[in-house]
Amino acid sequence: MTDFFAGIPQIRYEGEGSSNEFAYRHYNPDEMILGKRMEDHLRFAVAWWHSFAWPGGDPFGAQTLERPWFGDTLDLARMKADVAFEMFEILGAPFFCFHDADIRPEGATFAESKRNLEAIVDHIGARMERSKTRLLWGTANLFSHRRFMSGAATNPDPDVFAWSAATVKACMDATKKLGGANYVLWGGREGYETLLNTDLKREAEQAGRFLQMVVDYKYKIGFEGTILIEPKPQEPSKHQYDYDVATVYGFLKRFGLENEVKLNVEQGHAILAGHSFEHELALAASLGILGSIDMNRNDYQSGWDTDQFPNNHPEMALAYYEVLRAGGFTTGGTNFDAKIRRQSLDPEDLILAHVGGMDTCARALKAAARLYEDGSLERARADRYAGWETPEAKAMLSSSLEEIEARVLAEDINPQPRSGRQERLENLWNRFV
């Protein structure tokens, strides 16, 4: 035990009438929603990097957070893990996520870093044996160290490609050993700063082959989880190759991986790409590649990824409605890829940020479920496309332009516009949220 969270009680559900800030007002893990426990719908995860590894810096200022586990030794990494599991217990968090660099100290060589990773994975595994918290996903940090400044899989130096491949192998082994439900790849440096020194075709082919090797290794080791890619348009790279859902799907199709890899969709990244969160979720679901979500928000006045905790339940309800329409999560879940503000120094701030985020998502899920169960929106959607259910319309899709023209002339087809009823549906939505 550590004393970092001393005096903070375990967070329990007390209902909407509670004024206790250390209580859930909406998140009731055992509440049944559409035939499934709320906890099993949401599958909340705590992000190791933002909660325990982030020092509070920004582009204009250095570290503001002082944590007793900050440092590059295995003993401090073990302390960090102990604090993490104490927080999981306080929150009742069912899952966590990590990068290798979040949990182990950096070694002087790849071999030393791997030994450090294996040692801390053993420690985390021992903590998991005494905990109900499980691993939602693991991943490799292939963007922070200077060796990755020109990319990992897409790097012009084949030695960096080799280092990156070996690192991913080690992280996949760690994820499997800890019983992870997914493995994530995010290409923060897989992109370019200028086209003047970039070979787009070569870099795409390197990235495609890298991912094929990841999928091959999944089967070699018997990893039963899902491989996920997380799209983001830019930051830190000027232009990233995993720009958005549509771009990643095209990449997967190009390399024959559309049935092997799904997506981890983040709200903040969707906003950076000029989309809404629900757009990216709906598109991923329609393409059969929705796997998991990273839950956060951006400051709409800023032009960068601020990774704040969600606090707008009507906005989140739109997202969870799309998750429900897609059938809900299987191996995926809701990872809080969010960090407290750099002025939020106290341990209580870290706990309350997660309490607020979990309550916001729970409230959003309940609103989305009410509308989904009511069926009014889906009936309106079906009615809008009802014409396509007729035999003539279905047959048209397998005919030719000449045949369609002949039918238009013969039947004197002269279609008239129909209202999309947007305002009516927006009013309907507002009644439920």
UniProtKB/Swiss-Prot annotation:
Q: Gene3D superfamilies recorded for this chain? A: Divalent-metal-dependent TIM barrel enzymes
Organism field: Cereibacter sphaeroides (strain ATCC 17025 / ATH 2.4.3) (Rhodobacter sphaeroides)
Asked if Membrane is a keyword of the record, the answer is no
- Which classification does the entry list for the species? Bacteria, Pseudomonadati, Pseudomonadota, Alphaproteobacteria, Rhodobacterales
Q: What is its EC number?
A: 5.3.1.5
Question: What is the official name of this protein in its record?
Answer: Xylose isomerase
The similarity annotation says: Belongs to the xylose isomerase family.
Cross-referenced SUPFAM superfamilies:
Xylose isomerase-like
Q: How does it assemble?
A: Homotetramer.
InterPro entries recorded: Xyl_isomerase-like_sf (IPR036237), Xylose_isom_bac (IPR013452), Xylose_isomerase (IPR001998)
Mind telling me which PROSITE patterns this protein's record contains?
XYLOSE_ISOMERASE
- NCBIfam families in UniProt: PRK05474.1, xylose_isom_A
